[in-house]
Amino acid sequence: MCIRDSYSSGTTGRPKGVKVPLRDTALGDTDGVTALLGLLFGANQNTVYLSPAPLYHAAPLRFCRGIHKIGGTVIVMPRFDPLELLQSIQRYKATFMQVVPTMFVRLLKLDKTEREAFDVSSLESVVHAAAPCPIPVKKQMIEWWGKIIHEYYAGTEGNGFCYCNSEDWLSHEGTVGKAILGILHIVDDDGAELPVGEIGGVYFESDGNFEYHNDPEKTESAKLNNGWSTLGDIGKIDEDGFLYLTDRKAFMIISGGVNIYPQEAENVLTMHEKVLDVAVFGVPNDDLGEEVKAVVQLINPDQASPEVERELLSYCQEQLAKVKCPRSIDFRDELPRHPTGKLYKRLLRDEYWGDSESRIV
């Protein structure tokens, strides 16, 4: 059997080799990704696609390849930089772009005069994926660039695909979309399906088949006996069928028997005017098992101090229940991020756990 073998980003562990059977189609036939580029995002032979992410990751590679197949133009940036991105949009009159939410955050942290110095009116479609986007961030991007922002939820595994446009999102704030490939299910730890609105593991029912290279245990853990499969995320579905992601299952914190999803605190702290980047995760606590820790990269690293730590903790507690907020904050000059923009949170967690083992991984 012929297969396609790609590697995941490795944000929750070592990068996984994902083996997917090749479709039985002729070489020149339109593949699923190329079809979606036209149907969802309006890509055509006149498209100028700007890629701020490296091409060794599945999504940027497949989007660039798809644009080439339909005759469009691809511009690949050597690396992401917010000012250089705006310069490239203006210089090349880019019409289409795919980003991750961190790139939105970095763009919004620019001074207003810097943001307004560039003409981005050529943009027709901007897609983001790979991580949940804080609601205030997406609102501000739609206000800035207009209702041209799309979102999808999918993985290298190819077992399903959710999508929403700006109109969908504005009427269902926080959603990552409805399933357009596969059927969504939310299940509990025993594999039983949960009703609308309840939080559980996110699974797709589809004909997509995959396995992890040289890791049968990982492959088995991603699938239920009925064939449904998961990318490892936790979330819920509303009454209209829209999916909302809570966090990665591997990042869930269990503190004193309470399940805490660090994405909530990350979304809050990201919006503070002094914060450039943030990671929230569980660290060992003798009494509670785990406690919530934040590691923050400030816009001005010289401001790192106990006073700023107290300011950020207070800011978080004003918007979230105290149990969901960090007990302490450490400051770093830079957080470990994949060149695609994904956060390597596991590297930070490993520093704090040492020889201990998290009870959730």
Where are these regions (language model features)?
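Short beta-strand->loop structural element characteristic of the AMP-binding/adenylate-forming
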Residues: 16-19, 73-79, 150
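Conserved AMP-binding A3 loop
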Residues: 4-31
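AMP-binding/adenylate-forming catalytic core of the ANL superfamily
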Residues: 87, 97, 154, 193, ...
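Gly/Ser/Thr-rich phosphate-binding loop
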Residues: 10, 69-70, 94-99, 108-172, ...
